[in-house]
């Protein structure tokens, strides 16, 4: 098993050979018959317009090709679109397309297919919808050329076209209306319904005639969803899966069990204090209360005990390698219970208050009681609202509380995080809050470039921290566990490595 680390500007893209086994037994080195992945959760829909960012990326990449794609360092490169070019004021993006691609229903991939897909994304409610808002019109120049006319520059558009906005589904299938339950894409695999059971396993078979077969060497890919980490770990050690996203507390046991452990700087974990106007929780409408919550958390102790030191304490929600990161901001809220109580008293809550906090069970369950105790120590009583997965109204329950805890991706460029969490229509801004400073900066950042844009990002980040929009705890090291029969190149600023970065060990 190989492990290589290649440094980029501020982060490492980790190249590692990871472990594998198929079905119920060990796979041999060089075996391309099957790849089995343990996933963080179940799939809610096959419609790219409704997909939410995060762990569903493997499901999507099995059946859909993106227009662009990301390198291990999160740089953008061609895929279905062979060339891409902006005009001078960044309000038009021209894409040149491959002319040798078909969808699995034999429909031709062309400029009209791109237009249909992007129009569908604009109407959806998934992660792509926010990035799609900037697209005013998709012009079909010719069969292999499209021009995207934008309402304003969008720094995150290329990255969006490399994931959910850019996943291409058959326009015929989109028109038929069954894409949510039956995926039809131009991707490397076909969903095998006969060997698929919702919530248990999803089986994909290699698609004959796929244009980029060498990038996807496995004949079959199986994805098994596990909401609970222990179940996922047991599946790995008993040979039911080959690869999983783990937790820092698993590292000592994983090493003792002979598994490969690799880490990549990644997600932030903490609290989204989303009711900043105090609609459901009047206390959160006072910035002093939100600042008190930040002072109540002993981030260093939590990092050392809960995360095993894998990561860094943080008050920020952006990627450490992004243009928005300001190292000194991590010193803004030292652990200070007395200061927290002082701020609560000044805000009119000398005896504290009750706060509903929702969280995803399994994923956040171990951290929530730790955070609840720290808040209780300064008078904030946490009413826990657990959510078991995002299906059956779980996502709406999670987002419907004044505050919620989750593990959030951090992205490059930083504009992706802006679209995910900061606009009034963002997926993770359910209370639709904004303020004058954020509104101004979200208008100025897209129009700027280079150092000027970076300075505006930093101003935005500083404002968010100072006004305590969030209570981050750590930017953690994402943990990945496996056995030594497959090679995987990890990706910077992406929760899961893309499927094309999995290969049999050499």
Label each residue range with its predicted role:
Residues 162-215, 220:
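Gly/Pro-rich hinge or "lid" segments in bacterial periplasmic/extracellular proteins
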Residues 82-125, 141, 147, 283-284:
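Aromatic- and charge-enriched surface segment that lines or borders ligand/interaction sites
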Residues 85, 89, 96, 130-172:
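Surface-exposed binding/hinge segments that line
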Residues 110-117, 143-149, 188, 218-220, ...:
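Alpha-helical secondary-structure segments
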Residues 29, 297-324, 363-372, 394-506:
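Detector for C-terminal structural segments
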Residues 280, 312-346, 364:
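Structural transition elements
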Residues 209-253, 381:
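Ligand-site clamp/hinge motif
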Residues 38-86, 119, 184:
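N-terminal lobe/hinge region of extracytoplasmic solute-binding protein
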């Amino acid at each position: 098993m190989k492990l290589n680390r290649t440094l980029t500007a501020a982060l490492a893209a980790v190249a590692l050979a990871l472990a594998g086994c198929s079905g119920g037994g060990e796979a041999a080195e060089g075996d391309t018959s099957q790849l089995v992945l343990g996933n963080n959760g179940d799939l809610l829909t096959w419609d790219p317009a409704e997909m939410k960012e995060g762990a569903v990326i493997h499901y999507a990449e099995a059946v859909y090709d993106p227009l662009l794609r990301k390198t291990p360092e999160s740089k953008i490169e061609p895929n279905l679109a062979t060339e891409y070019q902006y005009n001078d004021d960044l309000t038009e993006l021209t894409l040149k397309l491959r002319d040798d691609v078909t969808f699995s229903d034999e429909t031709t991939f062309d400029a009209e297919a791109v237009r249909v897909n992007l129009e569908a994304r604009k109407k959806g409610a998934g992660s792509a919808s926010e990035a799609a808002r900037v697209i005013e019109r998709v012009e079909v120049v010719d069969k292999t050329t499209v021009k995207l006319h934008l309402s304003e520059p969008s720094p995150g558009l290329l990255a969006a076209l490399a994931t959910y906005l850019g996943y291409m589904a058959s326009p015929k299938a989109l028109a038929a209306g069954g894409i949510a339950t039956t995926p039809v894409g131009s991707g490397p695999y076909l969903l095998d319904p006969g060997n698929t059971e919702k919530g248990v396993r999803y089986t994909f078979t290699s698609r004959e005639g796929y244009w980029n077969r060498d990038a996807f060497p496995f004949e079959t890919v199986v994805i098994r969803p596990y909401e609970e980490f222990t179940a996922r770990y047991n599946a790995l050690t008993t040979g039911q899966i080959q690869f999983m996203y783990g937790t820092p507390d698993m590292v000592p046991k994983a090493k003792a069990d002979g598994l490969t452990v690799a880490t990549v700087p990644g997600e932030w974990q903490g609290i989204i204090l989303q009711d900043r106007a105090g609609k459901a929780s009047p206390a959160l409408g006072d910035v002093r209360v939100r600042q008190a919550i930040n002072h109540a958390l002993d981030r260093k102790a939590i990092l050392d005990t809960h995360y095993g030191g894998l990561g860094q304490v943080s008050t920020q929600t952006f990627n450490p390698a992004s243009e928005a990161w300001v190292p000194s901001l991590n010193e803004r809220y030292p652990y200070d219970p007395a200061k927290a109580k002082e701020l609560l008293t000044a805000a009119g809550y000398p005896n504290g208050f009750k706060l509903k906090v929702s969280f995803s069970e399994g994923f956040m369950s171990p951290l929530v009681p730790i955070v609840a105790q720290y808040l209780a120590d300064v008078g904030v009583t946490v009413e826990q609202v657990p959510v078991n997965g995002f299906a059956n109204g779980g996502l709406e329950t999670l987002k419907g509380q004044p505050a919620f805890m989750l593990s959030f991706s951090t992205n490059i460029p930083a504009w992706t995080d802006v679209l995910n969490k900061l606009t009034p229509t963002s997926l993770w801004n359910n209370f639709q809050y904004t303020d004058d400073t954020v509104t101004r900066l979200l208008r100025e950042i897209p129009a700027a470039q280079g150092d000027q844009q970076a300075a505006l990002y930093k101003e935005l980040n500083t404002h968010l921290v100072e006004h305590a929009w969030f209570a981050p705890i750590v930017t953690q090291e994402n943990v990945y566990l496996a056995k030594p029969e497959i090679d995987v190149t990890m990706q910077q600023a992406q929760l899961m490595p893309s499927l094309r970065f999995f290969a049999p060990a050499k």
